[in-house]
Structure formats: C-alpha cells, structure tokens
Amino acid sequence: MKNFYMMLAAVAAMTFSAQAQAYWDEIEIGDFENATEFFGGSYWDSAPTTFYLAHTGVQMIYTTEELSGVQGTPYVDIKALTFKMYNAEAFEDMTRDVKIYMQAIDESQFAVVDGVKQFFNFENLVYSGQETYDLLSYYGDDMELRYELQEPFRLAKGKNLLVTMVYDALDDDNCTSSRFDTEFYTSGITGKAMTYTDNWTSFLDYAMGEDFPDAAAMQGCGTNVDLPVTKIEVSFTPPTGIDEVKAATTGDDAYYNLMGQKFTGNMPAGIYIHNGQKVIVK
C-alpha cells in the first residue's frame, strides 16, 4: 500500500511538472441562490447601482474573510462578477455604460477624515462596455447581471479586493419611475460599500473634482451600504508537490481532480486539489 501511494505521488509530480492545471471555482458573497432581503433606506443605499438615477458609482471592499474560499492558494485570477436583482415593476430597457476597476488593497475599511468617509482613488480598468438590460423579459422575476472581465484580475493571497463600478445612462431620462421598481439583493454584510448617485454627473467626473474623495450625503453618497450578493468566478493554479495524504472525506469542502472536476463529500481514491494544495485521498 505504501508503494502504491508513492507511485501516485510520482505520477502527480510528473503530471504537474509537465502542465500547470488551472482550476475554476465560484465564491458566493451572501446566499446568492436563496437571497430574500433587499436593500432598505434611500436610493443611494443600493449596490452595485440603482436604475432610479442616471449616474451611479460604487466602491465595494471584499475582505479576506469574505474571500476565505480562495485564501489557500497563492493567488486567484478573477474572471467575472455576477449580481442579482429583483424586477418588481420595471418594463422598459435600461442602457448604461458600465466600467469596472479592481485593485488589491490592505485596508478593510473606508478611511474617515474630519468625520467624513473617503472614497479610494481608483485605477486598473478591467471591464468597459455598453449594457442594455431588458427589464420587460424579467418583469416580476429575478435577473442576474453578469460581467465577464476583459482581462482577468490577479488577487494575491492575504489581500482585500476593492471593486469600483461606474454606471452612466446615455439618456439622463432613462431611469425607473421608482427606487423600488428594481431592487438588488443584499448579502447583509454592512459597511463594506459606499455609493454615489446623481442624475446629471458621472462618478468619473466627480472623482476629478475638488470634492473627491469625500463621500458626503449632500453629494448623494451612501456611506454605510451593504455588499450585494455577489458571485465571483475565479481560476487558480495550485503549487507543485504533494502536501498531505487524507482519508476519504465526508464533509462539504471542495476537492478537484486532475481534470479540474469539482467534488464534495465522498470521492474515489486519487490525487486532488484542496485549499490550494495537492492531496492524496485514500
């Protein structure tokens, strides 16, 4: 039996030295599939946007705690973001220019200067596109907004993720008649997002003005906003070498075989990736 596992280890080493295998996973912030709670309060308390106004911006901090599912790997490549919205009563098309910026940061909170919360300076555009949301097709139903990044963003282990999103209407009148016509689902994780809302001025222009980085209520900013339920699609390449030998698992942890297939619960004996490490399951 000992020789059998030594042989498996040798095969694994040859396999991974010959070709680095990328693995895919999804990280859910909040209960994405079964979300029931919406953002409360004013229209400026909704992330990643509100269709009630023509121009919005949002900054969201996803900490290592929220991203714990990938922290066993040296890094992950973020491929896409998906948010979930309920279309209560809107039936017209909404067209927006959408831009997404991503940065790795050490901070887990927004700074406060003279009692005023501060936006982060932002850079590193990873998505830019014009999106038309066909709300009539989702009248009275859930709708997912998925954004596939034009280039993957690499996030190193131990870093927090700052996501800045800008939505600009092509026509300032292209808005819903009520803040409650379209509502995004909240994760319940409070204080990790801040918003900007205006019917005439883009967040990009605001970021170039003298009031930035202040997030003042008089500027239509929400400063204690929940993270929305979010699905983050990632890929990662595990390190080489066998790290440990395990008995067949019965838990809910994710294991990947050498073909990149995902397993949970009991699985056949073999070589798997678990928490960014190669393990032998016997």
Please provide the spans of the model-predicted regions:
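Beta-sheet-rich sandwich/jelly-roll-like modules and their strand-loop junctions
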Residues: Q21-E107, L170, T186-P238
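C-terminal tail/sorting-segment detector
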Residues: N3, I271-K282
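Short, flexible beta-strand-to-coil junctions
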Residues: M85-N87, M165-D172, H274-K278
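Residue-level detector of functionally pivotal "anchor" positions at catalytic/ligand-binding pockets or at interdomain
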Residues: I232-M259
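Bacterial Sec-dependent N-terminal signal peptides
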Residues: M1-W24
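Aromatic- and Gly/Pro-enriched, solvent-exposed loop/edge beta-strand patches characteristic
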Residues: K99-G188
